[in-house]
Each structure stands twice: as structure tokens, then as C-alpha cells.
């Protein structure tokens, strides 16, 4: 039984293909960076997972709205809140 939106198998998902754990942008990809992986935008240049969680959906929407046909996102550590971030990303990539 689903009692909250976060329990759905597919949560917010961009309209574009989303590649996880990218360390660089591929052809025609908009890269969302994290930590040492720089991108067109970044969830957190310092690797702060709380900052990354706060910016996640805004940056996914921005990536979906840009002119590149694909989205890539840097690896996010699975420590603490990073586990929840990775869960949301997995759901967003599941289309």
C-alpha cells in the first residue's frame, strides 16, 4: 500500500534520459556535478550531502529544461542522507 509519494517506484522523473554515476559528460549530456566532479551545475562543490539534497530537484528540473537531450549526474556517496539521494535518483532514472 502506498501512503506517501516517496514510496512510489517512480518518483519525479525528468523527461530526458538520466545516466547515474557519471564522472564526465558524455556526448549531448548536461552534467550535474558533485564534489570533485564538476559539471554544468553542481549539487555541492564541497561534497555536502545536505546541500545536495536541498538542490536535487531544482537541478533536475533545470537540466530537463536545458537544450541538451540527455542528463548525467555525478556519483553521490551512500553515507547518511546520501542513501536517500541515491534512492531518489534511482527512481528518477527508472522510466
Residue locations for each model-derived region?
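A C-terminal functional module that forms or caps the active site or interfaces directly
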Residues: 2-95
Amino acid at each position: 500500500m502506498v501512503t506517501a509519494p516517496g514510496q512510489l517506484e517512480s518518483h519525479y522523473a525528468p523527461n530526458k534520459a538520466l545516466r547515474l554515476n557519471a564522472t564526465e559528460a558524455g556526448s549531448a549530456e548536461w552534467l550535474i556535478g558533485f564534489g570533485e566532479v564538476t559539471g554544468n551545475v553542481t549539487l555541492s562543490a564541497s561534497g555536502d550531502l545536505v546541500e545536495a539534497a536541498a538542490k536535487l530537484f531544482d537541478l533536475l528540473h533545470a537540466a530537463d529544461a536545458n537544450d541538451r537531450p540527455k542528463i548525467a549526474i555525478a556519483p553521490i556517496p551512500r553515507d547518511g542522507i546520501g542513501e536517500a539521494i541515491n534512492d531518489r535518483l534511482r527512481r528518477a532514472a527508472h522510466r
